[in-house]
UniProtKB/Swiss-Prot annotation:
One of its GO terms (molecular function) is ATP binding. This is Mitogen-activated protein kinase 16. It comes from Arabidopsis thaliana (Mouse-ear cress). Residues 428-455, 512-567 are annotated as: Disordered. GO terms for cellular component: plant-type vacuole.
């Protein structure tokens, strides 16, 4: 039976939203599970969109974890931008003072940049340019709000098949104010070492600075170019060795700014190293791209460009118009007053409840007027979802992916945890032994054919969603991989792309589907991929027919490894 897409009256929609939101979302299946709780895909009957509902269990067991959740949902409410993942809704808890779980509705993204890099060995210079452009544009917006992400890495960059990227995971982000101390102790700073700026190596003390995020973006861009991490250090010493092997020994002044004493002594005693020319490290790469990358990877933080300066670089000539790109209003101190004092479990519970009210205007008005009851007089959607989540989670643990009885008749729902570009491929089932727990995000082990090597230490992730297949005469890709240019190739070339991109920049869109347009330049496969990519690379590059139109679909992962991701 087809869903009813008839437009409801405004009165009906308001009532449906406030008092019937349990019927708004049709739960479909479990798409991720971790120590935090469970994530289910769902269908939003209001908008007709696929969404992901994340249930976070026992969030107040540890105040630090609850504070991180509060920080993220608050920042994602304040930072509304096409290059930042969007929270669409937060379900109102059944009780203001006693709730333990929360349900957050995110937009559903198909993959992340980590999977894109693994699955595509024939990304073009246009992909590199457009990916970096989006990252810097989103980062400019974040930094103009005086927010610093602090944990940028490929797995925290979500991706869709139209080459749209979105920054996510703001749990470690911080807001800087004018009276912020010169040195901050990052008690929860556990960001991945590989993307950590050198001034942070071995030290949890650092001043809030945009240069930390710029370094991370540089590492991500370098990984796009080579297909493997640039500085995969095993420990702090190894990390410094890898950095200096490529960038050369830093100056005495730069070493003096490293806060960790042991790291300073190690760098001072290190033999003098000459920097490796970036053209040798990244052969066949646009010199303009390398010049910008070299700036972003400067050892000295003061030598790195800001996101706005990077967008103005000649590398983006004809693509970016910095003056048209949106900036954010600085976040006010009042929003993050809780960061400046010690808060209790009851404090953070009230603050999270207050955040959820932002998505319920009528209840928010009652709350602000002081007329809102502690216990609600209508059934909460949370109670409605608890049963469905429990049913799905039970079958998920048992190695099946059945839908609830009332949903099993719908044959068009997303299937198990592997995404195939070949619709005739049998659907793989997932056993409980394959579930990776204890991750901070939705995590499902991705599977490879037997004999294919994998990095056992790499957390496996991402969930299923239907990726649009190539159309209009697109070249046939190898099984499991959908390929295409950054945007439809046409005779208009780059001019069309700039015009389309300007239109996207001038408006805030919830699900942008347009990227830049320009002719595709053929790029040979990367030959220096890591072992984990050998099985994919062995199949050979996909061949694209010349002068053919194709839509942008570089995101889909290789056969048996593709996962989509919630958010």
């Amino acid at each position: 039976m087809q869903p009813d897409h008839r437009k409801k009256s405004s009165v009906e929609v308001d009532f449906f939203t406030e008092y019937g939101e349990g019927s708004r979302y049709r739960i479909e299946e479990v798409i991720g599970k971790g120590s935090y709780g469970v994530v289910c895909s769902a269908y939003d009957t209001h908008t007709g969109e696929k969404v992901a509902i994340k249930k976070i269990n026992d969030i107040f067991e540890h105040v630090s974890d609850a504070t991180r959740i509060l920080r993220e949902i608050k920042l994602l409410r304040l930072l509304r931008h096409p290059d930042i993942v969007e929270i669409k809704h937060i379900l109102l808890p059944p009780s203001r003072r006693e709730f333990r779980d929360i349900y957050v509705v995110f937009e559903l993204m198909e993959s992340d940049l980590h999977q894109v890099i693994k699955a595509n060995d024939d990304l073009t210079p246009e992909h590199y340019q457009f990916f970096l452009y989006q990252l810097l544009r989103g980062l400019k917006y974040i930094h103009t709000a005086n927010v610093f992400h602090r944990d940028l890495k490929p797995k925290n960059i979500l991706a869709n098949a139209d080459c749209k990227l979105k920054i996510c995971d703001f749990g470690l982000a911080r807001v800087a104010f004018n009276d912020t101390p010169t040195a901050i102790f990052w008690t929860d700073y556990v960001a991945t070492r590989w993307y950590r700026a050198p001034e942070l190596c071995g030290s949890f003390f650092s001043k809030y600075t945009p240069a930390i995020d710029i370094w991370s973006i540089g590492c991500i861009f370098a990984e796009l170019l080579t297909g493997k991490p640039l500085f995969p250090g095993k420990n702090v010493v190894h990390q410094l060795d890898l950095m200096t092997d490529m960038l050369g020994t830093p100056s005495a002044e730069a070493i003096g700014r490293v806060r960790n004493e042991k790291a300073r002594r190690y760098l001072s005693s290190m033999r003098k190293k000459k920097p490796i020319p970036f053209s040798h490290k990244f052969p066949h790469t646009d010199p303009l791209a390398l010049r910008l990358l070299e700036k972003m990877l400067s050892f000295e933080p003061k030598d790195r460009p800001t996101a706005e300066e990077a967008l103005a670089d000649v590398y983006f000539k004809g693509l970016a118009k910095v003056e048209r790109e949106p900036s954010a209003q600085p976040v006010t101190k009042l929003e993050f007053e809780f960061e400046r004092r010690r808060i209790t479990k009851e404090d953070v519970r009230e603050l999270i409840y207050r955040e959820s009210l932002e998505y319920h205007p009528k209840m928010l008005k009652e709350y602000l007027d002081g007329s809102e009851p502690t216990n609600f007089m209508y059934p909460s959607a949370v109670e409605h979802f608890k049963k469905q989540f429990a049913y799905l989670e039970e079958h998920y643990k048992n190695g099946t992916s059945h839908n609830p009885p009332e949903r099993q008749q719908h044959a068009s729902l997303p299937r198990a945890c592997v995404l195939y570009s070949d619709n005739n491929h049998p659907v793989a089932q997932q056993s409980s032994a394959e579930v990776t727990d204890g991750l901070s995000k939705c995590s499902i082990r991705d599977e490879r054919p037997r004999g294919a090597d994998r990095n056992a230490q790499m957390p496996m992730s991402r969930i299923p969603i239907n990726v649009p297949q190539t159309i209009q005469g697109a070249a046939v890709a190898r099984p499991g991989k959908v390929v295409g240019s950054v945007l439809r190739y046409n005779n208009c070339g780059a001019a069309t792309g700039v015009e389309a991109l300007e239109q996207q920049q001038r408006r805030m869109v919830r699900n942008p589907a347009a990227a830049s347009q320009y002719p595709k330049r053929t790029q040979p496969c990367k030959s220096n991929r890591g072992d984990e990519d050998c099985a994919t690379a062995a199949e050979g590059p996909s061949r694209l027919k010349p002068n053919t139109q194709y839509i942008p679909q570089k995101v889909s992962a290789a056969q048996d490894t593709a996962m989509s991701r919630w958010y």
